[in-house]
Amino acid sequence: MIVCIDCGHGLPTKGKQCLDGTKEWVLNSRIGEYVEDLLSEKGITVVRSDDRSGKTDVPLSTRVRRANEVADYFISIHHNAGIKGGHGGGIVVFWYSSKPEREKQARALYNRAVGITGLKGNRSNPVVKKAFYVLRKTKCPALLIECGFMDSVRDLPIIKTDEFALGIAQAITEFVLNDIK
């Protein structure tokens, strides 16, 4: 079993930052590192499709190619912004497939993440079918999780904590382990 973790964006990606200037990739990568550690402890091989240093924003086509070469699962980790003029909030999970099980997987990941972190989304449907490139083009099961809103005064102090990052990582790990049974 190989899981590809995709920590979205890179340090130089313009506009991808928190209200306090913290770059999105920093938050994404911290969660990705926790996921890698937790899955590795369970004997699952983890590869990353992003640049571990964050110095470059790896093109989406390269991320997908890396996943398609080896992965049995693809999880893209992001943090959200810009919804409702800073009034968006909570976790959102995106999926894209003609297979009905993909929506069930997305809902399972969302429920696990909210169950562990308590950061419930304020959207009417926080599990969304969306044709993002990394979801459309990967051959294995693929989900994209937005781990709270960087421009939300409610979410920001929560998403910057190690406790939250570890909680999201635990949710991803538990989801993968449960789904492969």
PLM segments and residue spans:
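Catalytic-core regions of hydrolytic enzymes
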Residues: 2-101
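Active-site-adjacent mobile loop/cap segments within catalytic or ligand-binding domains
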Residues: 3-6, 15, 69-70, 74-76, ...
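Hydrophobic alpha-helical segments
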Residues: 20, 86, 106, 160-162
